Regions:
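Short non-domain terminal segments
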Residues: 9, 17, 317-319
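Sec-dependent N-terminal signal peptides
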Residues: 4-14
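Subset of outer-membrane beta-barrel
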Residues: 21-321
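Short, Lys/Arg-enriched, disordered terminal segments
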Residues: 1-6, 19
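Hydrophobic core
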Residues: 12-13, 17, 174
Length: 321
């Protein structure tokens, strides 16, 4: 059993060398900011439903006999504004299914944010309690001694988690600070935790900065930078997106030491309430052990808020009030 525990530790260690990859990564991070920081839930004032589907390293084939192996992630989020008394709140719920070879993760998250309007900007605070269920198929792992795996199939473990964050915006500048994995969790599948290394959820701190520059009333440029650290390493994503008439957009991103991304999107309906986007990633570093292309689809539909203090404009042949 020592060999099995050692192999399990090596598997987790190799999967967490790039600490930012311990959680699902999305190329549309600039359009899905509440996933980065819970304080940004409905930060744009819109209740919405968001869907993301990501296929990473498309066409990757593992060296063992099992099919698949490339990461694939499905994401569903619902968020809305709430007005409880005088408290301007926002509520969001997220479901994520992430599959990576023999490992399958399911996340259920609940976000709560408080948006406070100030004289020179807006301050937002947010928390996100969540539950993670992690499944590992030991039958797909290769051991030096195959007898170590006899009788072992899929093992699962569930653990709570907590994220928190704050954001501040003034005019065209917004920045947000966040921290993930405030509750320590070790996914050891009932094995001796002293014999397994590299399987813990590492606490990660994040900074998200966004600026909007208007060339005209129809065209604006929106650069976004996301930096993450676990205090032993730093990774970053940089994106620049051009938006025309709030209707169509195009952009380019660079993910630290990994990939270049091209993004395209378009908003439909008269009020632009339905948005569809596509991201194409091309790996520029360490491409020998993976396929160089990834694809991601983005879909968002804006919904009316559950309750609102805004008085609707009612038009009749004689009155407008």
């Amino acid at each position: 059993m020592r060999k099995l525990i050692w192999l399990l530790g090596c598997f987790w260690l190799s999967a967490s060398i790039a600490f930012a990859q311990q959680d699902p990564v999305f190329s549309h991070f600039m359009l899905n900011a509440s996933y980065v920081n819970p304080s940004l839930t409905t930060y744009d004032g819109q209740a919405s439903v968001t869907l993301l589907s990501r296929n990473q390293w498309t066409g990757y084939e593992p060296t063992f006999e099992y099919e698949g192996g490339a990461p694939a992630t499905q994401f569903v989020n619902f968020s809305t504004l709430l007005q409880l008394g005088k408290a301007p709140l926002a509520l969001g719920g997220t479901f994520i299914y992430d599959e990576f070879g023999p490992r399958k993760d399911t996340y259920v998250q609940l976000s709560l944010a408080y948006h406070l309007e100030m004289s020179r900007g807006r301050l937002s605070l947010g928390v996100r309690p969540s539950v993670t269920n992690r499944v590992l198929d030991f039958a797909q792992l290769i051991a030096v001694d195959p007898s170590e795996f006899m009788g072992l199939g899929q093992e699962s473990q569930m653990a709570p988690d907590l994220s928190a964050g704050m954001a501040y915006s003034s005019n065209d500048l917004m920045f947000a600070l966040g921290v993930d994995h405030l509750i320590p969790s070790d996914f050891n599948y009932s094995f001796d935790p002293d014999g397994i290394s590299g399987n813990e959820q590492v606490r990660v701190y994040s900074l998200l900065v966004r600026y909007q520059y208007y060339f005209s009333q129809k065209l604006r440029l929106e650069p976004t930078v996301m930096v993450k650290t676990n205090l032993s390493g730093v990774t970053y994503d940089v994106n620049v997106r051009a938006i025309y008439m709030e209707k169509m957009w195009g952009g380019v991103s660079y993910r630290d030491s990994e990939a270049l991304t091209i993004l395209l999107g378009y908003s439909f309906l008269k009020d632009n309430s339905l948005s569809i986007g596509y991201a194409f990633d091309y790996v520029v570093n360490d491409s020998e052990s993976k396929q160089v292309t990834s694809h991601e689809l983005y879909l968002r539909y804006n919904l009316p808020a559950l309750n609102s203090r805004e008085k609707k404009i009612v038009r009749t042949p004689r009155f407008r009030f």
